[in-house]
Amino acid sequence: MSQVFDASAFLATCSARPGVYRMFDSETRLLYVGKAKNLKKRLASYFRKTGLAPKTAALVGRIAQVETTITANETEALLLEQNLIKQWRPPYNILLRDDKSYPYVFLSDGQFPRLGIHRGAKKAKGRYFGPYPSAGAIRESLSLLQKAFSVRQCEDSYYANRTRPCLQYQIKRCKGPCVGLVDAEEYAEDVRHSVMFLEGRSQQLGNELNAEMEKAAMALNFEKAAELRDQIALLRRVQDQQYMEGGSGDVDVVAAFVNPGGACVHLISVRGGRVLGSKNFFPQVGIEEEVAEVMAAFLSQYYLGNAERELPGELIVNVVHEDFAAISEALQTLRGRELTISHRVRGTRARWQQLAVTNAEQALNARLANRQHMAARFEALAEVLGLDEVPQRLECYDISHSSGEATVASCVVFGPEGPLKSDYRRFNIEGVTAGDDYAAMHQALTRRYGRIKDGEGKLPDVLLVDGGKGQLNMAREVMQELAFTDLTLLGVAKGVTRKAGFETLYLNDVAHEFTLKGDNPALHLIQQIRDEAHRFAITGHRARRGKARRVSSLEDVAGVGPKRRRDLLKHFGGLQELNRASIDEIAKAPGISKKLAESIYASLHSE
């Protein structure tokens, strides 16, 4: 029990009505938010002398202050609790990390509409289908629709400026509406079929296509009949993959699984009897909670926390919780529609439920196995480097450029659970001699660790540099300049053969040179973080180089300033299309005279 907080005095004045409570530490930091039908009874349970779970006891030991807000009923308490959790994300609450908006398939308005992926507010005019649980699931649907019905998926700006059909037309994924190769009536029929599929009416669509195929065959239009046959075969394959036996309506199947290492919630989205996809969630579990507590927290945050998320008619769950009635009532209050939460289900629905449980268990076990595998690598690295403690943070730096052009330095960060991608950084290197990797490394490290010295960011336990002796010496120089002399440094060189597994390593100075056997877990970790730094640097370099090259060929043309360059690239849909354009086509762009078009064409084709 907390020695600071007087629980007895607090409970003596605490209300027994419904409400929300907030627990703070001695520095007034919010630790935990909860709700209760009976505030006094619920809060008293925290201050029992025995029977507390270890993490609950740890929370209670930090409590210095408790505030309560009385509400009219439990539903109001639930809504307030979710708002506070979303706003403050207290460390001891179960937190749903994934709060991104979910993607929809978007069908634009117009005579020749496009299909695409949409996230966020639905401002554009058109139709929205979904939401889909992941970008992967939505890409599968769009790929199928492109193969089956050839509705365009290009951006409107690209479409509007085509003068010849693109590659999608050549591979029969588009019918070329941009250059008039398909009439509006045929295209509208393809759009209608796509909508039927997206609305879950695949059975009706299949029957309709069958009838059209027979009609085409009777009319001896065998080419059309063959096209319809291929569409039907594709739809049947998808039905076999996506349809659940006995499925109908809109259902989310949600299963939670908990073990001492963490928690996983697996969600399967079924719309119109068709599986749109599934997704794993790994909530941050702050207190040792039962699986039912994890489920209740997930349902509250997932469905109450996002007003734009579309609700199914029913949830099938694998556990029950006393809050389910309040959650249903809150959804009806907030969203204006009922949501049935089912637990005892039979037959096919029971199989759905068990499938979700199995997926949640397997996903959590795989995540924990990977975490344990990574932890073993960190322990091996500590042993190899002679560290007193297992490092908790590794940083690795790499440099990427093309003959000195568009130099980019990367910083990637790993912890015992894997990559910490939110801490990754890239540095655009300026003002150094082209191709001078040492100067580039000096600039990147000075910028990064200068900020750390000023209190921004965390100091790693081990700093790795890709490049061997020279880069390690440069890292030592920067650390000495900034007075980080105790930081462990590790240089990674490719070795004589330049093959993976034969790296030469340098610890702290070039005199301490060593190698590791190819099966050493520490070497595997070094290779993993080195390769990730290399990948991150290359992608940044390519993006920077591509951006520079998009405008460099136009920069020397008199009369083409930054705004006109942007307008030209927008008009043609990119530099590649502008390169393909003739002088006459360039002259048709807004604000471009024939003389200026000739200058632009000459600049683009000067090499």
From Swiss-Prot:
InterPro entries: GIY-YIG_endonuc (IPR000305), GIY-YIG_endonuc_sf (IPR035901), GIY-YIG_UvrC_Cho (IPR047296), Hlx-hairpin-Hlx_DNA-bd_motif (IPR003583), RuvA_2-like (IPR010994), UVR_dom (IPR001943), UVR_dom_sf (IPR036876), UvrABC_protein_C (IPR050066). Keywords: Cytoplasm, DNA damage, DNA excision, DNA repair, Excision nuclease, SOS response. GO terms for cellular component: cytoplasm; excinuclease repair complex. GO terms for molecular function: DNA binding; excinuclease ABC activity. CDD domains: GIY-YIG_UvrC_Cho. Gene3D superfamilies: 5' to 3' exonuclease, C-terminal subdomain, GIY-YIG endonuclease, UVR domain, UvrC, RNAse H endonuclease domain. It comes from the Bacteria. Residues 16-94 form the GIY-YIG domain. NCBIfam families: PRK00558.1-5, uvrC. Interacts with UvrB in an incision complex. This is UvrABC system protein C. The lineage of its organism: Bacteria, Pseudomonadati, Pseudomonadota, Gammaproteobacteria, Pseudomonadales.
